[in-house]
């Protein structure tokens, strides 16, 4: 049994770990503040895990429909893949965005109220941006034309809170169409370097060996933590 298998077994058999996953121990008011749908309850679980020393937790906000009191929406989409063939982007957003806003604001307030903001960094992001212009296609479920947005790697976002960083600022901007960066372009390698910095890792010098024993750096050459946040 290698070190990873041993750690997995310890996690599954530890009474403390089982207790961390029991979110019914949370006060009803706290659970309701986050919202009783899966996104809110998963966020509470994430906080309970970091309270117990878990260094990295991922919450995937997918499929808000049909559970937690959220009715199924024919024009909605399982994830955030808002192509016109998948969803009516405006109808989907009217359901999805208020849920997102409630969970994220509740998480930030909760972390600060518990004093966790000094050692916990909350990062909210996606895999890439969306086209500045809408496309219109027949929906795969609705069979009628509906608006959507396709993949757009030229501009994206990352929202950060906590982690003892310099917050209250917007770093970088795009043109008025959300098409291209025009001021302080930020590469995601800089974001990654910033996250490693928060974890206490020197991303510019630390390497990880692959299965052939070859060293790989954690970030691309020249990538540094964002000076606006950690300087």
Locate predicted features.
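Ligand-binding pockets and gating/stacking loops
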Residues: 1-231
